[in-house]
């Protein structure tokens, strides 16, 4: 079956709206253009990841910033780790095909309280955690973590 991007985007907007997770001033259509991966169960969208390319100034490098949302009834099943690993793989492959974009890895800003125990570890080495390394904090005190690609080279 062919991928239906318009359906995935509409389903993602519906999921974000149902869960009330988008900032009030953000057009959901903008976030939908950032979709990276989606998962369905019995025809219902149960999770999405998004990716935004941006510089991480303290590392002087460009990363894909990863976000993930899993529907509450499907959480605590390892889906977020699966989304993370899969999204990282997609981004790494894309980065190799587009070296002019100079995307050197995947970054994430930790927002989930479910990761509080992991957040005490500077490097996340557990299976599926992609070796995410703590590199700093946002102004709101949230952890910034990165996973460098094997092909990454600094200028």
What would you call each of these model-derived segments?
Residues 41, 69-72, 110-112:
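Short, flexible loop/turn elements at secondary-structure junctions
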Residues 57-58, 96-155:
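Terminal substrate-recognition subdomain of acyl/acetyltransferases
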Residues 64, 86-90, 104-110:
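Hydrophobic, well-ordered secondary-structure scaffolds
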Residues 19, 23, 90-98:
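Solvent-exposed amphipathic alpha-helical surface segments
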Residues 70, 76-93:
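Conserved acetyl-CoA-binding loop-helix of GNAT-fold acetyltransferases
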């Amino acid at each position: 079956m062919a991928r239906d991007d318009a359906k995935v985007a509409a389903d993602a907007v519906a999921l974000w709206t149902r869960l009330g997770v988008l900032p009030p001033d953000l057009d959901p259509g903008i976030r939908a253009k950032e979709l990276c991966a989606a998962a369905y169960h019995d025809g219902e969208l149960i999770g999405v990841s998004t990716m935004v390319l941006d510089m991480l100034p303290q590392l002087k490098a460009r990363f894909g910033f990863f976000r993930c949302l899993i529907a509450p009834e499907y959480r605590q099943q390892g889906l977020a780790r699966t989304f993370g690993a899969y999204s990282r793989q997609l981004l790494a492959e894309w980065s190799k095909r587009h070296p002019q974009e100079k995307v050197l890895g995947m970054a994430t800003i930790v927002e989930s309280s479910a990761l509080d125990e992991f957040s005490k570890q500077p490097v996340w080495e557990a299976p599926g955690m992609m070796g995410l390394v703590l590199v700093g904090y946002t102004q709101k005190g949230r952890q910034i973590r990165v996973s460098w690609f094997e092909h990454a080279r600094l200028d």
